Amino acid sequence: MAAPMLRHLCRVPQSGVWTRGPRAVRPGARGMLVAPRARGLFKEFFPESGTKTELPELFDRRRAGSPQTVYCGFDPTGDSLHVGHLLTLLGLFHFQRAGHNVIALVGGSTALLGDPSGRTKEREALSAECVRANARALQRGLETLAANHARLFADGRPWGTFTVLDNAAWFQKQHLMDFLATVGGHFRMGTLLSRLSVQSRLKSPEGMSLAEFFYQVLQAYDFYYLFRHYGCRVQLGGSDQLGNIMSGYEFIHKLTGEDVFGITVPLITSTTGAKLGKSAGNAVWLNREKTSPFELYQFFIRQQDDSVERYLKLFTFLPLPEIDHIMQLHVKEPEKRIAQKRLAAEVTKLVHGQEGLDSAKRCTQALYHSSIEALEVMSDQELKELFKEASFSELVLDPGTSVIDTCRKANAIPDGPRGYRMITEGGVSINHRQVTNPESVLVIGQHILKNGLSLLKIGKRNFYIIKWLQL
């Protein structure tokens, strides 16, 4: 007996794949797709022609009459989204802003297999418990980003809905033999083997496991399930997902005779050409506990001049004329990094909210501009995020506590004459102010900030954070 989720499978249509040639599309129908493509956000459309309804016509509300549904998948192979996920999320948000409904699909089941796309070797296997925990974390992250988007980037237009789902909701109800009997028969081995992601792995020394090979079948079924239950006709994914998207298209078309579509976004790579993802070990996370707002902000501040215009178009909702104006100002005074600062501000606000952006700016002022004012209003959390390697101490401020007393209690200098000389020779600063008299008594408001903290620096790189008690 077929599993519950498979009972609605349709018969394979006799007509086969559509073979119509491309035809003219009504003026204005391409608008929804033209704007993101002009920004460089949409890279490839599949299929581009030969379908009953052309992809641009789906998004022509005058013709379609109702909003479309678009989805993108996020496998919980880690416990946080990272900057490599941002482009597909921005793609979903652009559809939502145009009034269409979007689904962020967490792969609580597919992550157990591991997507081989774009990988040179098999992923490290994760336990079911780990995947479930990661899936919950990704769902929270997606909901936070969607909430920030709605709260801080509203433009007055009626938006579509943003829904987060987990494919474990339907795959956990499946039975292996039923699934293979009812779904497996609609996939041809030759077609699956022809995918570039499969070919590259089969030619590699490590080869490819059956679990990885089967991944594209499960992703195709995701697309089918969302098509049947949510009316979803468009899948969004990274450019390395095109093969999986094609499998979904072929599966749905065989079963229903209907056309669905895929849109890819470009992959963002590091300066060495490696994909910016956690697998490469260079991830910038979208979770504050893993990458602070300050670190995210600085990641975009550090982008090169030859990349910043492209990133403004990809990672922000700023109108293209405004981006042109920003770049004109930037070219006149590149040393001010006007474009990078605007890019960093827009992304940090989307990921961490206005509070996170304010925190990133405070940390920037405190670290790079030696701002006492910024230090005074920083929270314990911000100080720990900014000075991750710093030792954190809680000390009682006794009457007459001196500079050398403080340094020794914090274990910041060696005992004896050597530690004394480190102070007299200018190697110690408190709150960005050099101190050279070891016997100087600490002064509240100078050595101890309004927030009850002191930032002690020994040499050029060693920081110590002191929280004073009983002030």
UniProtKB/Swiss-Prot annotation:
Record-listed E.C. numbers: 6.1.1.1
GO molecular function per UniProt = ATP binding; L-tyrosine binding; protein homodimerization activity; tRNA binding; tyrosine-tRNA ligase activity
The alphabetized UniProt keywords are:
Acetylation, Aminoacyl-tRNA synthetase, ATP-binding, Ligase, Mitochondrion, Nucleotide-binding, Protein biosynthesis, Transit peptide
- UniProt record, GO biological process: mitochondrial tyrosyl-tRNA aminoacylation; tRNA aminoacylation
Could you tell me the superkingdom of the organism this chain comes from? Answer: Eukaryota
Cellular component terms, GO, for this chain's entry? Answer: cytosol; mitochondrial matrix; mitochondrion
Q: Check the record and name the Gene3D superfamilies matching this protein.
A: HUPs, RNA-binding S4 domain, Tyrosyl-Transfer RNA Synthetase
| UniProt subcellular location | Mitochondrion matrix
Kindly list the positions annotated as binding L-tyrosine.
71, 115, 215, 219, 222, 241
Q: Does the keyword Mitochondrion apply?
A: yes
User: Which reaction is the catalytic activity of this chain?
Assistant: tRNA(Tyr) + L-tyrosine + ATP = L-tyrosyl-tRNA(Tyr) + AMP + diphosphate + H(+)
Record family assignment: Belongs to the class-I aminoacyl-tRNA synthetase family.
Q: How does it assemble?
A: Homodimer.
Q: What PANTHER family does its record include? A: TYROSINE--TRNA LIGASE, MITOCHONDRIAL (PTHR11766:SF0), TYROSYL-TRNA SYNTHETASE (PTHR11766)
Q: What is this protein called?
A: Tyrosine--tRNA ligase, mitochondrial
